[in-house]
C-alpha cells in the first residue's frame, strides 16, 4: 500500500515538473539564440526562437491538461518570455538587420544608433505586453470564456516568430541601407502591435477532441510535412498570417461599424426631395 502511495506521489511530482521543463527548454532556446547571434550564426538563432515558440505553447497546455498550474509556473514563464522572445529577437533584429550595412560611414553609424533605440523599444514593448497580460489574467479570472479566446495586443512570441521567420527565409544579413530602414519600420510596427488593443486569437484552449478532430489532426500533419519540406516559405507565411490576422479583424469591424452608421434609415429617406 505504501509503495502504491509513493508511486502516485512520484507521478504527481513528475507531472508538476513537466510544464517547468518546457519553460526551461524555452530559456535554453533563448540563450542559444543569443549566443548564436554573437557568433554571427543568424539562421541558428532564428531556428532556436522557432523551437522556443513550440515549447512556449506546450508548457501552458500541459499545465492545464495535468491540472498542475501554479503561480511559480506563471512567473518563470513570463521571465522566460522576456529573455527568449524579447532580448533574443531584439538582438537578432539588430545584428542581422544593421550589422552589415554598406553605406556612407556617418550615415550608417546614425542608422545603427537609431536601430539600437528601435530594437530596445521592441524589448520594452514586449515586457510591457507581458506585464499587461499578467495583470489582466489576474483580474479576469471570473471573466466570460470569450476573453480567454482573445489576446489584447499581439503576443510577444508572434513578434519574435515573425523576426525569426524572416531571418530563416534569408539568413544573409541585410547590406542595403534602404532595406535596413524598412526592417526598422517593421520592428517599430511589431512593437506598436504588442502594446496596442488589437485583438488576436488565442489557441490556448484549442481542443483536438471536438467534432472536427480528424480534420484538425490531418491539417496538423499536413502543416508539419510542409514545414519539413519548405520551412523557409511556410514559416514566414504562418508568421505573417497571424500578425496580419488581428489587423484584418480590426479593419473588418471598423468597416462594419462605419457602414452601420452610414446605412441608417435616414440614409434612404425619400421625403427629402
List PLM regions with ranges.
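Active-site His/Glu-centered metal-binding helix of metallohydrolases
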Residues: 28, 54, 58, 62, ...
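Topogenic membrane-insertion module of multi-pass membrane proteins
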Residues: 1-57, 238, 249-250, 259, ...
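Helix-coil boundary and interhelical linker segments in multi-pass alpha-helical membrane proteins
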Residues: 32-47, 90-120, 166-183, 229-233
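C-terminal membrane-associated helical module and adjoining short loops/tails
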Residues: 1-7, 141-273
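Alpha-helical transmembrane segments of polytopic integral membrane proteins
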Residues: 31-34, 51, 55, 89, ...
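C-terminal ends of transmembrane helices
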Residues: 61-71, 127-142, 195-204
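Hydrophobic, well-structured mid-protein blocks that either form specific transmembrane helices
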Residues: 118-156
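Multi-pass membrane catalytic core of lipid/isoprenoid biosynthesis enzymes
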Residues: 18-24, 65-133
Amino acid at each position: 500500500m505504501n509503495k502504491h502511495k509513493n508511486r502516485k506521489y512520484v507521478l504527481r511530482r513528475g507531472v508538476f515538473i513537466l510544464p517547468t521543463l518546457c519553460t526551461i527548454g524555452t530559456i535554453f532556446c533563448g540563450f542559444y539564440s543569443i549566443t548564436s547571434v554573437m557568433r554571427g550564426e543568424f539562421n541558428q538563432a532564428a531556428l532556436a526562437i522557432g523551437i522556443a515558440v513550440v515549447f512556449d505553447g506546450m508548457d501552458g497546455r500541459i499545465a492545464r491538461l495535468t491540472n498542475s498550474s501554479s503561480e511559480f509556473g506563471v512567473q518563470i514563464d513570463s521571465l522566460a518570455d522576456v529573455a527568449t522572445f524579447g532580448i533574443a529577437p531584439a538582438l537578432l533584429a539588430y545584428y542581422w538587420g544593421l550589422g552589415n550595412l554598406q553605406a556612407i560611414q556617418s550615415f550608417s553609424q546614425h542608422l545603427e544608433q537609431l536601430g539600437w533605440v528601435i530594437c530596445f523599444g521592441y524589448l520594452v514593448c514586449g515586457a510591457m505586453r507581458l506585464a499587461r497580460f499578467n495583470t489582466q489574467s489576474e483580474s479576469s479570472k471570473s471573466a466570460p470564456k470569450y476573453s480567454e479566446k482573445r489576446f489584447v495586443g499581439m503576443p510577444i512570441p508572434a513578434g519574435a516568430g515573425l523576426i525569426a521567420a524572416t531571418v530563416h527565409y534569408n539568413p544573409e544579413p541585410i547590406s542595403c541601407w534602404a532595406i535596413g530602414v524598412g526592417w526598422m519600420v517593421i520592428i517599430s510596427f511589431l512593437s506598436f502591435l504588442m502594446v496596442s488593443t488589437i485583438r488576436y486569437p488565442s489557441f490556448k484552449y484549442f481542443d483536438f477532441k471536438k467534432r472536427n478532430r480528424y480534420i484538425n489532426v490531418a491539417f496538423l500533419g499536413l502543416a508539419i510535412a510542409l514545414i519539413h519540406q519548405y520551412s523557409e516559405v511556410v514559416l514566414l507565411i504562418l508568421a505573417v498570417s497571424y500578425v496580419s490576422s488581428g489587423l484584418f479583424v480590426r479593419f473588418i469591424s471598423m468597416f462594419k461599424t462605419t457602414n452601420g452608421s452610414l446605412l441608417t434609415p435616414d440614409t434612404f429617406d425619400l421625403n427629402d426631395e
